[in-house]
């Protein structure tokens, strides 16, 4: 577990320095317009801290999944190596400039930006073009990542990482630069992520409930295995619940089920029992014959799902039980929705869990942490995200932490003495 306390931007001397900040500006862009700027706004406190202290910022990010060119490729006459219109960070520079209320310089080639960096004075901001326009950024070969890192590191004096969402990947800009510069500091967003996950994994207020949903048991095996040694209650929802229920001998109709994981489900339930973890599975379901929204889906009377029906959300009795468990806990970690929340008729379970967590946090001081990805989207959609202690910005990164893995992009940062 790489969650030792890290030196943060507050420990770094930034006055008069050029500060390289790896941010996460991987925002949704449609026809050149940013449709959600949450990630840009999330990075502002770290950027503003550097500017206030008299430093300048050199910002690096990826956007989307461009194919990426090689550093050795010849430069095209009128364009940039690896350039893809759909993945340019140019619209982000414009939006960031509005949010900061100052000009943000834009370097159209992240590996040919030395002249831009050289001109920076205290209080200036420079955004480099998409680092993933170069294949070396996330290359499997360390020497290729390091070659790119050396070019980027030469632009600045201090390295700050504020991109928790990509901390589970070894890359030129997440792990390469701090190795070249010999130190790395956590930005405010990264610090918050590390602190909340360290608390829930190492020393949570108890009782602690893990709420785990989503489609497949196979996606969450390591998470369940690791968390069973740390939690008091395990609440299971989403399609993965039906694999557990079939393993217990219940009828699941035509609900999604991983037939080859039934023995695994049994062994996880046995392990929970041995560790005194109370496991809660749905006792009723919201069903339909087809995977589509309907005005009046079937609600089962009990745990059994009738033949020809698939369960697509947890039922009202289950919601009540899950709400009661959340109400008696002091910490919650939630990863994975309870049903097909994108369809309103199957969103009640997911939104009820979000509401119970939001209420508990605001009224009873519950520590509520939401893993990123779908769960964060569901919390946003329910209107409860603002009421949680912490909504993680990293889907893959938060999942790997909950699985007990260390994150390369966190491990590489300088430890607090």
Curated annotation (Swiss-Prot):
It comes from Crithidia fasciculata. One of its GO terms (molecular function) is metal ion binding. ATP binds at residues 215, 220, 239, 311, 342, 374-375. AMP binds at residues 215-216, 220, 239, 311, 342. Pathway: Carbohydrate degradation; glycolysis; pyruvate from D-glyceraldehyde 3-phosphate: step 2/5. GO terms for biological process: gluconeogenesis; glycolytic process. This is Phosphoglycerate kinase, cytosolic. (2R)-3-phosphoglycerate binds at residues 23-26, 39, 61-62, 64-65, 132, 168-169, 216. ADP binds at residues 214-215, 220, 238, 311, 335, 341-342, 374-375. Monomer. HAMAP family: Phosphoglyc_kinase. CDP binds at residues 214, 219, 238, 336, 341. It comes from the Eukaryota. Mg(2+) binds at residues 215, 219, 374. This cytosolic PGK lacks a C-terminal extension of 38 AA which is present in the glycosomal isoenzyme. SUPFAM superfamilies: Phosphoglycerate kinase (SSF53748). It is found in: Cytoplasm. Keywords: ATP-binding, Cytoplasm, Glycolysis, Kinase, Magnesium, Metal-binding, Nucleotide-binding, Transferase.
